[in-house]
Amino acid sequence: MTIMRKTHPLLKIVNHSFIDLPTPSNISSWWNFGSLLGICLMVQIITGLFLAMHYTSDTSTAFSSVTHICRDVNYGWLIRYIHANGASMFFICLFIHVGRGIYYGSYVLNETWNIGIILLLTTMATAFVGYVLPWGQMSFWGATVITNLLSAIPYIGTTLVEWIWGGFSVDKATLTRFFAFHFILPFIITALVLVHLLFLHETGSNNPSGLNSNSDKIPFHPYYTIKDLLGVLLLLMVLMILVLFFPDVLGDPDNYTPANPLNAPAHXXXXXXXLFAYXILRSIPXKLGXVXXLLLSILILXXXPXLNTSXXXGMTXRPXTQIIYWIFIANLLVLTWIGGQPVEXPFTTIGQIASILYFTIIIILMPIASMIENDILKLHT
């Protein structure tokens, strides 16, 4: 008799994805972040659902409904802080996941990579509309500043912004629709995740050596299930330390003041997750150029397969590109720091230099380094 998991129509899918999946025998802990992102998504959907049971998306009651959740609902404070800090953990895992993809050349799996970029953009959109919901000062002004960027689009900009707002400013209609978007987007993300996995399992996973691993595969279960479980436990431990000891360390104190359209906070800072893109946005004086650069900062990832000039797949055995890669990571951290600083010298200058460096590394330095390495390889063969 054959095993049920291999014959049952539903269990067969699970079996081919998580149990009998042939996996490279040498993938490192950097490959754990895919499963961690799945856990983050599940945690966010569950906590979000419970928050939505008590939240009201009306300008007059939104702020007090969040207060009510924290004060009166059983473990409401816990659910809220898991949701808020879970989002930060989600983005940390996302950036590590993308960084690993760039380092080990996973972008050669085109469909998987492109869906990953769409996932990144969708997650950023979800985080943005979610940040508006508590209706604090930062929520309101963040929404105003970011939606206003669309007014830079020639001819239709202003009309487009007013259409998104549902009026002439961020108001009741905006909050209600943002809540609707925030509710639906995670399910769209879940669907995209399944497509992401579908395309990944067509080709199989990449591995640290960058070589074809078809001759050396092991079953996903028990080897990687137990490895992923360790990752999940570590993730949940870090998340719970954040939630229970430092719940507000990644938040903004301004968001504890109810939204007031009449006075703006000293400086509106975007959510911690998208700060590097925000700094690139602020580095360009013209509004349209800034919006274009903001989009490009993420969309440039789509060009990574095309910009790949190397003969070898990953960066494991490419020291010159490795150095440039780590400069790139340091530069990203600088951009993230600048994004949280006020718009004054020397921060603006540092931001502009870091922004130029961001694009220069991806478009010029990395391909050149790869070509030089190819030439060195030819010399030694």
Curated annotation (Swiss-Prot):
Give the bilayer topology. Answer: Multi-pass membrane protein
Q: What is its main location?
A: mitochondrion
The protein's matches in InterPro entries, at most eight in alphabetical order, are given as: Cyt_b/b6_C (IPR005798), Cyt_b/b6_C_sf (IPR036150), Cyt_b/b6_N (IPR005797), Cytb/b6-like_sf (IPR027387), Cytochrome_b (IPR030689), Cytochrome_b_C_euk/bac (IPR048260), Cytochrome_b_N_euk/bac (IPR048259), Di-haem_cyt_TM (IPR016174)
> What GO terms in the biological process aspect are recorded for it?
mitochondrial electron transport, ubiquinol to cytochrome c
Q: Which molecular function GO terms apply here? A: metal ion binding; ubiquinol-cytochrome-c reductase activity
- The residues listed in the UniProt record as binding heme b b566, with positions renumbered to this chain, are 97, 196
Its needed co-factors are:
heme b
- Per UniProt, heme b b562 binds at 83, 182
Q: Give the matching Pfam families.
A: Cytochrom_B_C, Cytochrome_B
The note on cofactor binding and number reads: Binds 2 heme b groups non-covalently.
Transmembrane segment boundaries: 33-53, 77-98, 113-133, 178-198, 226-246, 288-308, 320-340, 347-367
Q: Where does a ubiquinone bind?
A: 201
Keywords of the record, alphabetical order, are:
Electron transport, Heme, Iron, Membrane, Metal-binding, Mitochondrion, Mitochondrion inner membrane, Respiratory chain, Transmembrane, Transmembrane helix, Transport, Ubiquinone
> Which SUPFAM superfamilies does the annotation name?
a domain/subunit of cytochrome bc1 complex (Ubiquinol-cytochrome c reductase), Transmembrane di-heme cytochromes
Q: Which GO terms describe its cellular component?
A: mitochondrial inner membrane; respiratory chain complex III
The record's subcellular locations are: Mitochondrion inner membrane
Q: What does this protein do?
A: Component of the ubiquinol-cytochrome c reductase complex (complex III or cytochrome b-c1 complex) that is part of the mitochondrial respiratory chain. The b-c1 complex mediates electron transfer from ubiquinol to cytochrome c. Contributes to the generation of a proton gradient across the mitochondrial membrane that is then used for ATP synthesis.
Q: What else is known?
A: Heme 1 (or BL or b562) is low-potential and absorbs at about 562 nm, and heme 2 (or BH or b566) is high-potential and absorbs at about 566 nm.
Q: Which family is it part of?
A: Belongs to the cytochrome b family.
Oligomeric form and interacting partners: The cytochrome bc1 complex contains 11 subunits: 3 respiratory subunits (MT-CYB, CYC1 and UQCRFS1), 2 core proteins (UQCRC1 and UQCRC2) and 6 low-molecular weight proteins (UQCRH/QCR6, UQCRB/QCR7, UQCRQ/QCR8, UQCR10/QCR9, UQCR11/QCR10 and a cleavage product of UQCRFS1). This cytochrome bc1 complex then forms a dimer.
* Name of the featured protein: Cytochrome b
The organism is Hylaeamys megacephalus
- Corresponding gene? MT-CYB
